[in-house]
Curated annotation (Swiss-Prot):
Belongs to the eIF-3 subunit E family. The lineage of its organism: Eukaryota, Choanoflagellata, Craspedida, Salpingoecidae, Monosiga. This is Eukaryotic translation initiation factor 3 subunit E. Residues 219-391 form the PCI domain. Residues 476-485 have a biased composition (Basic residues). GO terms for biological process: formation of cytoplasmic translation initiation complex; translational initiation. Component of the eukaryotic translation initiation factor 3 (eIF-3) complex. It comes from the Eukaryota. Keywords: Cytoplasm, Initiation factor, Protein biosynthesis.
Amino acid sequence: MAAHDLTQAICQNLDPHLILPLLDHCVDLDIYNEADLKRAKMQVLSRTRLIEQALELADATEKKDLDARMRSISEEEKTWEKQLEPVFEMFENDEVLSIIEATKNKDSLLSELEPYGFTENTADLLYHGSKFYFDRGQYDLAHGLLYNYRAVSTDDKLKFTALWGKLAAAILSGNWQTAQEDMYLLLEYIDGGKNELTAVEQLQQRNWLLHWSLFVFFNQPDGPDGIVDLFMNKETCTNAMQTIAPHLFRYATAVAIMSRRKKRDVMWEFVGIARQDKDLGDDPVVGFLVSLIKDFDFVTAEEKLQQCREVLSKDYFLAEMTDEFINTAQLYLFEVYLRVHSRVSIKNAATRLGKSEDDAEEWLVKLIRDAKLDAQIDPASGEIHITKPVTTVYQHVLDRTKNLQYRTYVIVESLHHLHPNGAFHHSNSSIPALFRRMMNEQLQGGGKSNKKGDYKKGDYKKGGDFKKGGDFKKGGDHKKRAWVK
């Protein structure tokens, strides 16, 4: 199943330190050559100062070079400890912290802190020192240094860079609440109009953030639900995914299926996107959804579901949710099956579910009750008979047109983005043609539309008015994220 493994695609958008957990996960899987994994890990470690880990993998020749580098790093660490000692003492002073919180104008902050030993060089020490300790794997210390750097720095570009670093440090230290706050703060900056990013840079930054967000969302109890809201933000994130990283739709689709009662409408958005990108439909998770609710091809849906079990069990982010996904997907499959069939054989259902007939009957009864279907069991034939509700013409029209107002709004917004100054004419024949096409798709059941998924904002403040944050930029031969020196 290496063909469906996303490790390589995801690693191209991560900092080297974030790549290491994924490579360690791959060691336990029987899909990559062990020697290739070892070589890949050594290449990643060579871009860090994690010499101890590299020594465990190195051969005799490599160890000589690593021993020399280890001695150099040890001397460098002593130098940083000496340089940062007065800085640590200064930030342990409550008066200093009070001044930082109270001073709104960062330009005047330097003069306010001068009596306590703060100089122009202090901010540089915080920034570069955090980079050193991050590379050494001391993520908590690096996070604290970056927090203080962002509190006193007046360099907006470096503060943005530091925000990426702070997010990475929070992820690697398992501080998920702070990581989530940093993630949304980064998104706010990227999407804001005050940054100096070009449209292409914004697109790439969003792409990186979406990949990094997987660590945040899948390591919190209620985190996965937020992934759909973020990924399906049409004005920003959805475009980045479709353009650069369509493989990420696997995660949003999987979460939507697992929480389908709350995310039912958004499933049609995934189907619509998959129709535009045929390769996306090859993904087992997305393919399952398309086969089920678009094609009503239950045989293919079952085949895709079997693939999902194997693929998800080896996915770094979804492995622990495999059973939950399979159980929910089975429920969804049979619910759709019951809605389009008038009778279901209990014996056939038992075979497909891998249950006894009694257990299958009990399982189906519970499903019918939860789905609020009108059905009866016929003991003589061993079948469940489903009574289809009769829908009046008026109700049918209402159901088909209830989202037209929102779809019209989307069209107007799209035209506004194409012509921000309102420079389009109502006589333009392409506009009513586009409107009619969208209307026809809605009336013909071409898919349901969900409202714009606004990502949630968190409370980014900690103990004062200055904000938290951190940042990497992408670099390296393989386009891995790295600090800017």
